[in-house]
C-alpha cells in the first residue's frame, strides 16, 4: 500500500488496471534517470534507499483522514485500495475508474502534511553518519517538492527521487553509483522482489509501519528482514554495516 497506492506503484494499478504479466525488474522510467544522475553520491560509501509511504510517512492514517472529508472510508480487508474504499452513505466501493482522480486529489491535498513514522528521523540521522540516504518514492513527479518539504519538516532532509513503477532498475542504477553496500526499505513485496532480481547484493528490509497492514500481509518472501519499527531496522543495518567493515 506504499507510495500512496495499493500494492502497486502506478496510478493505473490504483485504478484497477492490471500490470503487465511479467514486468521487467530492471526497467526504469525515463523520468527517473536524470533524477538519479543529478544526485551527489560518494563512491565507496554505503547507501540506504528508503521508500516513503508506510516507511517514513504514515500514509494510511493520512489517507483515512482525507477519505473522511470526501464521505468515504477504507474497509481494510485486504492489502489493497481498489475495491476497499467505500462510500459512507451507500457502503458501495468506489469504482476502479474513479480511483485515479481520487488519489490525485489525495496527493494534492495531503502530500505536504502526512505524519512521520515514529523513530524514522532519529534512526536515519544516526545511520547517516555511516551511510548515504536517498528516498525512492512513487509519488507523482509534480508532487515531489511537496514530499521533500514534508520529509524535511519532519527532520528527514535527504534527496527524494520520484519513481514510477517497480524499483529494481532505480536501485540498480543507484548501486552502480556507489559501489558499496546498499540497503533498501519498502512495504511492497513486488518492489522488494524487483530489487532482489535487479541487484542481488542489496540488503532488503520489508518495513510496514501500520500494524494493520503488517498483519494483512506478513513478511515478503524476498526480504532479509521484516519489521514495523525503526529501532529494529536501524539495528539490522548497523550490524550489517559493521560486518562489512563500515
Describe the role of every protein-language-model region.
Residues 1-28, 231, 235:
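Short glycine- and acidic-rich boundary segments immediately preceding or forming the N-terminal edge
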Residues 95-96, 108-134, 141-148:
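Short, acidic loop-to-helix structural element flanking the phosphoryl-transfer center
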Residues 90-107, 147-153:
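Short, basic/glycine-rich phosphate-binding loops at helix/coil junctions
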Residues 140-183, 190-196:
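Substrate-recognition "cap/lid" segment bordering the active-site pocket of phosphatases
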Residues 159-165, 223-233:
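Short acidic-hydrophobic, aromatic-tinged amphipathic segments that line or gate anion-handling sites
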Residues 42-43, 130, 176-181:
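Glycine-rich phosphate-binding loop signature in dinucleotide/nucleotide-binding domains
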Residues 184-228:
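Acidic, Mg2+-coordinating phosphoryl-transfer loop and its flanking beta/alpha structural elements
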Residues 15-98:
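Active-site neighborhood of HAD-like aspartate-dependent phosphohydrolases
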Amino acid at each position: 500500500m506504499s507510495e500512496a497506492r495499493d500494492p502497486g506503484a502506478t496510478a493505473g494499478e490504483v485504478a484497477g488496471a492490471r500490470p503487465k504479466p511479467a514486468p521487467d525488474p530492471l526497467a526504469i522510467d525515463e523520468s527517473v534517470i536524470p533524477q538519479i544522475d543529478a544526485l551527489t553520491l560518494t563512491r565507496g560509501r554505503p547507501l540506504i534507499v528508503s521508500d516513503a509511504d508506510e516507511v517514513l510517512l504514515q500514509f494510511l492514517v493520512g489517507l483515512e483522514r482525507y477519505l473522511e472529508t470526501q464521505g468515504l472510508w477504507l474497509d481494510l480487508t485486504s492489502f489493497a485500495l481498489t475495491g476497499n474504499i467505500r462510500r459512507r452513505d451507500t457502503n458501495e466501493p468506489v469504482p476502479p475508474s474513479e480511483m485515479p482522480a481520487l488519489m490525485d486529489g489525495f496527493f494534492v491535498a495531503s502530500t505536504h502534511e502526512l505524519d512521520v513514522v515514529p523513530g524514522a528521523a532519529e534512526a536515519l540521522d544516526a545511520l547517516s553518519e555511516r551511510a548515504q540516504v536517498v528516498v525512492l518514492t512513487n509519488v507523482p513527479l509534480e508532487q515531489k517538492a511537496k514530499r521533500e518539504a514534508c520529509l524535511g519538516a519532519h527532520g528527514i532532509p535527504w534527496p527524494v527521487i520520484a519513481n514510477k513503477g517497480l524499483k529494481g532498475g532505480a536501485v540498480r542504477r543507484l548501486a552502480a553509483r556507489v559501489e558499496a553496500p546498499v540497503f533498501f526499505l519498502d512495504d511492497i513485496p513486488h518492489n522488494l522482489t524487483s530489487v532482489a532480481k535487479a541487484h542481488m547484493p542489496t540488503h532488503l528490509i520489508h518495513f510496514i509501519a501500520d500494524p494493520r497492514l503488517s498483519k494483512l500481509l506478513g513478511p515478503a518472501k524476498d526480504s532479509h528482514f521484516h519489521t514495523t519499527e525503526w529501532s529494529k531496522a536501524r539495528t539490522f543495518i548497523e550490524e550489517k554495516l559493521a560486518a562489512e567493515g563500515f
